[in-house]
């Protein structure tokens, strides 16, 4: 066991439905109590994950508890989980310093000045999509835009869930198409296709859902047309204070790492804040600390989810899903449905679309070649399906970041998901695409 951290763990058995019990317990515990209380914010997700993690550690009596704990800890500390946590930490610090310098209020004023009130939700969706398309990460985009969306909703008297939902949806749409996103890289590499080709195939599926999403967000139910924003004035100070956001978009086009972008944003917020006399260096440090601490719940959930996934994989749960999927495939159409089912279920259990694509990708390539499915189509199905699933689970990174940054208005995961139109429309578009595909 001393060398556990230095090698990749293989499942102790080929496949086992029993390994999925902890996740089933999580679903029953979290959804069950939430439905009983009719309040999804009453049951902390951390408690649900602790409960299911305890069950995961109890399973497999053939191994000692110490070994299972080490395996669980190894999953908590995996590279992708730690990178995600670093993004959470930097996002918290960036948001806190941006709020302190007045960048959020300035961005709200600019948005109110240029976007009519009845189109504000659609406008946020488009802005979020463009930033995510440039930066290549939905998480980084959500971290930057959600504070603006919340403040904007409060100033316009709108339901914050509308704007936060539009932000998350737009970020996922942009991430799904971006040439530099992790999901694009993972799906194209596993299928050995060009990124541009995958994007073209993605557009065939998600263009109509995205347009429908924008049009639906223009409906009166999502707006407050009685508010007049024509008198909102802005000055040069407002543009200077939003420079970190603008540079985030510009640097994103240069394929710069999102963590580096957030770090640069924190530094710029600090320099601008001190320059405008909003705070001194010590207050800036304090704001950074407060921002990182505000993400603590999100960090805990991410690490517990990583540990739980490691136990499910080690006990043969992922192998079980893969093998059962392969047995249901008999022709080309079945193959496409199978690819979507495979990556979707794995995403459901891992809460990480990149990990789901990397896990399902090699199997998807093998069965796609067997049934003559275009690898560009397979890459697109992997990417789009994982985006759909990631947007409808309350414990995905995108929703967790959004709820953390919208804590001031007490938004639960499900209040955001109910207003998150894009993933649902994408799922519908994906289903239509699968049904209409040639056999």
Where are these regions (language model features)?
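Re-entrant/interfacial helical elements at transmembrane boundaries that shape
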Residues: 140-152, 168, 179-193, 321, ...
